[in-house]
Amino acid sequence: MSNNTTSLPAENSSHPRKGTPIRKKQREEAQQFINTLQGVTFPNSQRIYLQGSRPDIQVPMREIQLSPTQIGGSKNEPRYEDNEAIPVYDTSGPYGDPQAKLDVHNGLPKLRAAWVADRQDTEALASVSSGFTQQRLADEGLDHLRFEHLPRPRKAATGQCVTQLHYARQGKITPEMEFIALRENMGRERIRGEVLLQQHPGQAFGAHLPENITAEFVRQEVAAGRAIIPANINHPESEPMIIGRNFLVKVNANIGNSAVTSSIEEEVEKLVWSTRWGADTVMDLSTGRYIHETREWILRNSPVPIGTVPIYQALEKVNGVAENLTWEMFRDTLLEQAEQGVDYFTLHAGVLLRYVPMTAKRLTGIVSRGGSIMAKWCLSHHQENFLYQHFREICQICAAYDVSLSLGDGLRPGSIQDANDEAQFAELHTLGELTKIAWEYDVQVMIEGPGHVPMQMIRRNMTEELEHCHEAPFYTLGPLTTDIAPGYDHFTSGIGAAMIGWFGCAMLCYVTPKEHLGLPNKEDVKQGLITYKIAAHAADLAKGHPGAQIRDNAMSKARFEFRWEDQFNLALDPATARAYHDETLPQESGKVAHFCSMCGPKFCSMKISQEVRDYAAAQEQAAAQAQAATPTTAAQPIDITQPINMLQSGMEKMSAEFRSRGSELYHRPANLSAEANNEPT
């Protein structure tokens, strides 16, 4: 990025909150973040690229460098054994490459532009198709807000379908599919250590998890509808990724401005921040002013797929009056967003007129914003949902730009009391019907799920979805497993997310600490993402996804060997891990200490285990040397009790040490310090 200070466009607003000191500070901080934006990676990590079959297929990974393990020698001449670097999945795009030149005013490099052009089945449009977009472009009063370098939108050529599902069904392996295969394998072919490659068998609940993911396997899964590649031809900046239960569990982050808070620069900041902390996709749920302009800035700077809920913007166009929505206006909104580059639309097309009365006896009614909008429209007109009625036309639009459909659960339960009720599953069955229609047009589909569901009722959600939605990928909000923890709903939902991810859910929509309370800020986004990356990883481990345990094994080895710096660097959040450690052991000596602050130097279980192991090994070596010096015959039996006796001897020695210190579990720090210095206590 240029060193010159630049500014994102300022929004003019008469809203009173915009002028408050807190709002001003937030915007200034976001502007500073944008001004100083440069590619960065985590401590002791480096960006690497896995090369594909053509020069422009380069898959980014983050490689965590580890320190060597001391395996012997003396204090003055120690002997070391190298530890392998650990490659990990990286969603940060160019923002995670210290060599990248970044400028949000120009946007990211168009990674996929050549791939789209090479297929020769699209054409650049002479002008935008959306009447609303034409109005915005003609409004000179918006020039100060507009992304300056607007690309010309593309569309499928006449008679062509440009979806990844269409190519997959034709037997074509696209560059996107090859990119994904390399990415999903996470570079684990680079790992050679037997300890790192050990993994417990998983329980996959019917998922098929091959040892090595190939581009052909990716093609097969997409062709079968079990996975989607959200990749609008007008969002060439995005790096290909896949959502499906036979792949790594993915995480979505929600961002977006509202009528009372946030600005364009803050949303761009949240986008970059989200990709840094592991968001596989990002949904722009903006409902405030300048939705169109905000989305353009986000898309041009996003290395991950972007999803939206188009009904939110359509509602803004009718000043929030749901009854005034029309199909024509909504269709124009779809064209507007498809030509900007939105990768997937959430549509609440399964909220049917006859299902609305089913929610009357619920404790919390209809809690989905999109679901309530469509329910109100249906009741006010006493007509069927226009999204359902015009679903085939929607599919035709999506097929022309490769916009995936995320069929929304507008009747999801908003409390555990309402979980798994008649309305929820009636809508789910309708989403299965719509899935088949979308597939007729080669449009990619995933299914959205709840919501609030107690643990014992979660698995049924997965089995119902697989059966009635024909194994299309499932994408759930949590689910939250209890309703008693406002402020901690990233925890209540993370529990449910880990469970449903294990059962086969393909993507988890994060929940932040602000759920039910307010709009998330930057720190809330991080907390939600870390929680959900834990849930997704736990699900991958439980399923037995090949290679999922490598990072865990590396962490455990570093922990046992007291390699503190490696423990920090292998963590999902290295800075927090280091900060917690340094609260009690801030000195540099604490980074090499063979104990932690919980047990201290005199009662560390791992230190004791190492001492016992070393003692037993020394005893065994001495016995072997003695035996080698004694003539034996081939018929002499081997004494298998010797190693056991040696271990017992080691344990007895440590027991004596424990008793000699007074048989106390814990010791005062002053006493430990005095003992270490041979002072009286």
Curated annotation (Swiss-Prot):
The gene is thiC. Catalyzes the synthesis of the hydroxymethylpyrimidine phosphate (HMP-P) moiety of thiamine from aminoimidazole ribotide (AIR) in a radical S-adenosyl-L-methionine (SAM)-dependent reaction. This is Phosphomethylpyrimidine synthase. Residues 15-25 have a biased composition (Basic residues). Residues 1-13 have a biased composition (Polar residues). Its cofactor is [4Fe-4S] cluster. One of its GO terms (molecular function) is zinc ion binding. GO terms for cellular component: cytosol. Zn(2+) binds at residues 452, 516. Homodimer. It is an enzyme of class 4 (lyase). The lineage of its organism: Bacteria, Pseudomonadati, Pseudomonadota, Gammaproteobacteria, Enterobacterales.
